[in-house]
Structure formats: C-alpha cells, structure tokens
C-alpha cells in the first residue's frame, strides 16, 4: 500500500497527519511525501519523521502545484494500490486496513472512499456541514456518478485506488480547476468502478488557510467551467442543445456558461408544485437542494426519461 501525501506549508498540522499514518494497523505500507515548495518548515518536519520511520519517503520540489506533486508521488509508488491523504487531515487507525480488505473482497471496484467527519466543530460552517452530509449519503457507484456535476462526490483524501487505473488515465492533470473532480470524471468516463465505505475513517480539518477556501482552482467559477466542459463532451456532445431548468441566480449563471448550447430556458416557480411539464430531452436541471433533486428525479424517471442519457442535474 502506497500513501500519497502532498505537502505545502502544513507545519501546524503535519505531525498529526503523519502520526495518524504511522499508527495504521496495516503496517505494510509506505508514505510518499512530496514537499512542494514549503516555506514554513514542513520539509524539515518530514525529514525528521523519515529518520524515525523508514516507511516514509520524502521528495522536495520547488512548488509546481498539487497535480504535479501527486503525479510525482504516484510515479514513486511501489504498491498496486495507492491511497491519498492531505497534510492537514487525519486517518482513523483502521482506515487503510479496512479499505484494502474491502477492495480485496470486491475485485470489480477500482476506486474506494470512506465517509468522513469535519473538525473542529467551531471552524466548520453550515455550507461544509451540508456538503459532508451529502457526501456521506453517496455510497454506491451509481449515486456518485449521477451527482458528479453537483460537486465532488468522493473526498480526495479518502481515496484508495488501483495504481494501474490511475496511470491509465494519466493521473492528475493541471488545468486550473479542481484536480480531484477532473480525475473522477475521467475515471468514470473510462469505466472505473467507484464505491464508498459506510465507516467514518477520515477526518477533514477545517481552517481558514485550507486550499478549499483559498485556492482559486476551487472557486465556483472554476467548478462551473469544469462541469460545463463535461456537459459539452457528455450529454451535449455532437452539438446537442438542451432545455435548461432552474431558479434565480443559478439558472442565470448556467445559461451564461452554456450559452449557445441552451435552446430553451425555463424558470421554476417557488414553491415548485411537483408537476412536470411536457419536456423533450436533453434536459439540464440547475437544482441545488437535494430534496428537490430527488423529487425531479422521481418525476422524470416516472415519465420514462433516463438520468445521464436524457437529463442531468448541475449545481
């Protein structure tokens, strides 16, 4: 088992991350840490830890970015299975063992995540709590695939994947947007099978300097650019034009993003009555609330439409 640990300026939290990996019950693992241009002493913390634990391999780079750091770590991995961890997070001591055991019992699966918890509570906002509840509700391949244009359905740090599958799609790409969702989309397109353990085996630390909050690659605009490209190469490939359905600002943003690919725009009334008008696919539904998505999903499938072939949800 090879664990990929990219690091940049994580000194306050790195010792906890390393300790959580060192105490894994799966002793036969290696941690490949890439210090990507840290200026806060993270590199020195890694070197000291490597002298104590030969399972820790350290490389230093001048700051090429997260996708490059992950690609370097992947190239150094020796095991057929690789896992991810972020330098400011922690893994449950049974995490690697349970994921590897599950994958051994399910040879058709290629990518496996886990449920997670957010900590500390006083740094966790309402939006992240909603996201975590949504993430933890998606356990199957099909549920993650159908929500792929909502947000990343599998937290990057929880990933364990077959190394060869990652290599087959070229690993992580630098395209100026979320590298994890970009990777998931390419893996789903190539037929990789996803799953998620129902156990909470990963702790995602919340703090004001986390990349999720500060890195522009995770901005709403960049996410929408990635999703719109996926739509153009997926549901709307070949120049297909869609009916766009939604409410308010979200509807307007998606209309602007998809432009000429939108043939008709339909704004929903609030509250939505549940009645479904006669609609011709393809349909793009900018519906933010999970409960509303479920109502629309049931109604459209009840009309004989197929999700991902005739309609998709976006956010």
Predicted region positions:
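N-proximal low-complexity "stem/linker" segments adjacent to membrane-targeting elements
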Residues: 1-20
